[in-house]
């Protein structure tokens, strides 16, 4: 069982908020989902059979973990303050002086500056060297960043080294940093430099989930649902998917809706499933739009409403989710009904930021 796919973050573009990383895209694999299901039954919201990809937290200056070194407290660190204000050359000068004086957080900040290329030429080997110094001092955030650099690599400039990545991620995972726990689960899943042990993978994802990491919650739910038989637990899978759904993660909302609809790990509740599909559809997810359209077309979880079904499927179809039965339903509408569906689709389009135009049947 492979855990579901993640977006690979660009480290250059991700320097605004520490700990904020790429969620599963709201339309994961939507473009490839053009086949029409044979029977009405909400399916998986996206293909969970891909491979976990690197998730990077490199989004601002480093924050020292509670059990990490705290030289002079980072709040009063002038280099950190300059970085946050966008004064990168000032931050570089201050951090260099402080790093030479042995301040660990400044070594990590230098790594961030050289890795991101903010205000200076990007230099990944130099970034790695500063991270290594800070990690040796005991900074788990530096260990995380160094581990992610070795995990992804950068061609000839910095070769990927999964073994070194695992070593550093283990240091960061010991401080319960969710990105480290998540990516360490990746390495165990791959089974090359660390054993593919379902119990270890489950434990790492559980620890990441318990920190409040919603992506890990979804991954854990998928793993408990579809992973190796020895660790499967439908009820716990539904629990974690539901928790991620309630925190706003769109793919989790679709997964949880599917579980509610089918009664897997939870008491069947088609009406509640419809509510979750609608939440995800309102955020622009085409898979959810299609599932909601089916619900309206078949009267399961909501009263039959061919106008709503046609309007929602219009938007799903525009994003590549084709459904021959729903398309046939739309074509069977009277001219008046098509006009109503067009008006409703326009209302939905405003809500989700699209500009639909349905042409009435001639």
Please give the residue ranges for each predicted region.
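Bacterial N-terminal signal peptides
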Residues: 10-20
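N-terminal leader/linker segments that initiate helical-solenoid repeat arrays
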Residues: 23-108, 354-362
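Terminal, low-structured helical/coil segments at or just beyond the last alpha-helical repeat
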Residues: 38, 51, 56, 63, ...
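Hydrophobic face of amphipathic alpha-helices that form TPR/SEL1-like repeat modules
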Residues: 75-81, 109-116, 147-154, 183-190, ...
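Structural signature of tandem alpha-helical TPR/SEL1-like repeats
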Residues: 85-90, 121-130, 157-168, 194-204, ...
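Alpha-solenoid helical repeat scaffolds
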Residues: 96, 125, 132, 170, ...
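TPR/TPR-like alpha-solenoid repeats
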Residues: 113, 134, 149, 172, ...
